[in-house]
Swiss-Prot record:
GO terms for cellular component: extracellular region; host cell presynaptic membrane. It comes from Conus fulmen (Thunderbolt cone). InterPro entries: Conotoxin_omega-typ_CS (IPR012321). The record marks Y25 as: Important for calcium channel binding. The keyword Isomerase does not apply. It is found in: Secreted. Expressed by the venom duct. It comes from the Eukaryota. Keywords: Amidation, Calcium channel impairing toxin, Disulfide bond, Ion channel impairing toxin, Knottin, Neurotoxin, Presynaptic neurotoxin, Secreted, Toxin, Voltage-gated calcium channel impairing toxin. One of its GO terms (molecular function) is calcium channel regulator activity. This is Conotoxin FVIA. Disulfide bonds join C13-C28, C20-C32, C27-C37. Negative results: has no significant effect against all Cav subtypes tested, except for Cav2.2, as well as against TTX-sensitive sodium channels of mouse DRG neuron.
């Protein structure tokens, strides 16, 4: 089971260093719905 606390707070995408919300957890893989990712 993944720790929700890790996804709960904003996480920096690997490589990009941009912050993403838990909803945009897939931002690091290229998928981002909400939050600043690119």
């Amino acid at each position: 089971i993944l720790s929700l606390s890790l996804l709960d707070r904003s996480t920096r995408c690997k490589g990009t260093g941009k912050s993403c919300s838990r909803i945009a957890y897939n931002c690091c893989t290229g998928s981002c719905r909400s939050g600043k990712c690119g």
